[in-house]
Amino acid sequence: MSHEKNEASGYPEAQSWKSQEAMLGARTEVSRWRAVKNCLYRHLVKVLGEDWIFLLLLGALMALVSWAMDFIGSRGLRFYKYLFALVEGNIGLQYLVWVCYPLALILFSSLFCQIVSPQAVGSGIPELKTIIRGAVLHEYLTLRTFVAKTVGLTVALSAGFPLGKEGPFVHIASICATLLNQLLCFISGRREEPYYLRADILTVGCALGISCCFGTPLAGVLFSIEVTCSHFGVRSYWRGFLGGAFSAFIFRVLSVWVKDTVTLTALFKTNFRGDIPFDLQEMPAFAIIGIASGFFGALFVYLNRQIIVFMRKKNFVTKILKKQRLIYPAVVTFVLATLRFPPGVGQFFGAGLMPRETINSLFDNYTWTKTIDPRGLGNSAQWFIPHLNIFIVMALYFVMHFWMAALAVTMPVPCGAFVPVFNLGAVLGRFVGELMALLFPDGLVSNGNLYHILPGEYAVIGAAAMTGAVTHAVSTAVICFELTGQISHVLPMMVAVILANMVAQGLQPSLYDSIIQIKKLPYLPELSWSSANKYNIQVGDIMVRDVTSIASTSTYGDLLHVLRQTKLKFFPFVDTPDTNTLLGSIDRTEVEGLLQRRISAYRRQPAAAAEADEEGRNGETGASFTGEAESSFAYIDQEDAEGQQREGLEAVKVQTEDPRPPSPVPAEEPTQTSGIYQKKQKGTGQVASRFEEMLTLEEIYRWEQREKNVVVNFETCRIDQSPFQLVEGTSLQKTHTLFSLLGLDRAYVTSMGKLVGVVALAEIQAAIEGSYQKGFRLPPPLASFRDVKHARNSGRTATSNSSGK
């Protein structure tokens, strides 16, 4: 019947079939698009996880940041000179502009870093060295530090002071590498890399920082290896070169785009002769530059350290400077700006030149001792002072900028020492070159050929040698020939740099290692070949035997006691205190989390409700107790506001954040409970107030004591089941190698699976450096005891063997 009805009615049935087919087709089309979309998304996620995508993104980003920083800094210096020229003729206004402009910028940079991220102050390379070696330094690789470092460094460079960009920019590049890696991990859904891959990422970031700072991709990789790593993975070579080359290319292209340069050239382009760049007779002069640079580089590190140590001493001046953080940079800026005032004392040592202008003038092809009219020399004319010898001007520049640079880099702003030291080395080399040109005015004759002396070549070699002496790196020679485009001078550069390193390493540590020692950062000293007595030391001689551990049978009270007594970040996890078999390692935060989940106001809610049900309290009793409890809580909260420390979980927080000893108030007093303070501190009182009011203070105290006696269930926390282990007989040399390669900060010492001690960076450092008494280095006492015992045993063995024969 219905079929006939459909036939009589015409097309409704066909129309319904068409609509169903259309809907089915639409669904099919949507499913196809979804499949294509999912495929593209998976492909995109896979591509974003590739190393080369990460390197290209990081290289482009760092090139853009470096170019923007240079662009803003150059415009700031140009505006500085414009203001100074605007008030020409009025000495008072000129002095005011010359001093106030850098003063405002330095104070802004210092204040901005102090507010946003104090970790942004300084170079950043010493901290990176310790992070790459396995130490954990908080807030050094965060977005806040990146913002503070970038803004502070840009503003500080605009002041025209002897401050460098290289160190802070290496830190900036490492932060960018870390943040970009986290972003790509989040997008692609993969977990963050373990330590050894994170170290590779930081190393690549350091290489990119050097590459796009100077436009030197080869030197960027080599310098990052020398300065930041004790061991470098070969797998990271191509990453460093790819990212460095791409970032340097983008950095130079951006300079051409804004018409700062005509084409892709070296940053400090030179035009020395290329057919025969130097003569063999000049090698002694190059060697003298290297040796002198070694002495002056060590002196620079020593002077810088003495300034920092003096500022850290407790006296009246340092107390004022610590309370008012802006006084020190203000005083230093005022003194340096006053001494560098061009119409004043600054006119006698070329203080009117900015850092880049100074380098360009020192690298020119002119011989200043032969110049009669300096007006055609451009910026080099600043070195010519009427009635004053050019050698005196260069000597004054070297002496004044030597201590000025050592003082300026101690200011609490993002700054490095590479460029100031580079300038000092260039002046030293130029001084020797001009002296050679004066001694041999007609040049040097060799095999019938005449070679003219170019002092600019000596300046380049001096710059490489001085920076190598301060940083203890040989790759500064590669930086210099990439900066200047003069690869033909590699041999004399290498000779001078190696000699400078030999002298400087025998006198002082590098500038970065010196800062590490001053800041007492965790680091691992190098184990030199000459330390033969160190190879007789074993782990059993230097390990800490009194180890605080957590057993699988521990109670919550035991955990609280452990957190109170120690400030360790990790605890060894053993089966029982008697057998002491090592099962793993537990993070301190995991232990705190266990206590927090067990002894807290939220945990008391069901306990209070259950106890109320068991005792059958009525509303009248509860209401009468409520007012009583509120008054008691108000009194205890008032005591807590006065800063008294509480037992329980509050003691955990106090011991974690403040290492002071616990309060001498007896723990038996009911008011000394942690849950009450947690109610005020964490804001849980509003949620749990109805249940809390059902318990008296004595009941809360008894409940907490009962909970502390409960055995901990460690299944709810993360335990590292494979902590690094050593045996007592492991040599110090092998331990040092393992710590360096794997970036360890501690290792547990076991014997047949039993925990017998722990060795950390501090013990290895003390063993390598040793203790000094009247010039003699003493080995650890246990090592001497073991050697004597070994000698006795060997003597007995020899006696028995001889008697057997």
UniProtKB/Swiss-Prot annotation:
Top-level division of the source organism's lineage: Eukaryota
Membrane topology summary: Multi-pass membrane protein
Intramembrane residue spans: 125-132, 201-213, 217-225, 456-470, 471-472, 473-484, 485-489
Stretches in topological domain Cytoplasmic: 1-48, 508-805
UniProtKB keywords: CBS domain, Chloride, Chloride channel, Glycoprotein, Ion channel, Ion transport, Membrane, Repeat, Transmembrane, Transmembrane helix, Transport, Voltage-gated channel
Function, in words: Voltage-gated chloride channel. This channel is thought to ensure the high conductance of the non-innervated membrane of the electrocyte necessary for efficient current generation caused by sodium influx through the acetylcholine receptor at the innervated membrane.
Identification of the protein by name: Chloride channel protein
Native source species: Torpedo marmorata
